[in-house]
């Protein structure tokens, strides 16, 4: 993401949440519009049980005499990621608020973005940043165990999308093979050159 683009779509699968959030926050402050898809596949370092206990303790933080006043805790992976990014932005200022509005976090890869190019952030990838022996867990599992109800729906939709994209890729690669074969046939090219092609 060294150059400015109209819209950056990041595939969050296999990224560490905090590291990805810091990179995204930096881009948002620079004026970039960012869409983060597959937030349920984000990773958090540390054992799952430890992270669950920490999150349950976080959910208990509320106003004693009127819990409806706040603090408000989100269960959906996209909202958890958005709140992580918000903590890295000056969201109470106009500049920070505008930056936060340029972020869109989603579970799965919904239709407008499934046919567009998606990027990864090498500085935030778990395989490059975490020791192989270290424990980690996904936000999708954590969210589903603390109250997120849509894990099954998102996984079904993702399975459908993967089947469609695999079929599209096979058709595209078969078409590309024909193009490559056509390019290598020199006799045909010589005949076409006679006619000015």
Curated annotation (Swiss-Prot):
One of its GO terms (molecular function) is structural constituent of ribosome. The keyword Metal-binding does not apply. Keywords: Cytoplasm, Nucleus, Ribonucleoprotein, Ribosomal protein. The keyword ATP-binding does not apply. It comes from the Eukaryota. PANTHER family: LARGE RIBOSOMAL SUBUNIT PROTEIN UL13, RIBOSOMAL PROTEIN L13. There are 3 genes for uL13 in S.pombe. Belongs to the universal ribosomal protein uL13 family. This is Large ribosomal subunit protein uL13C.
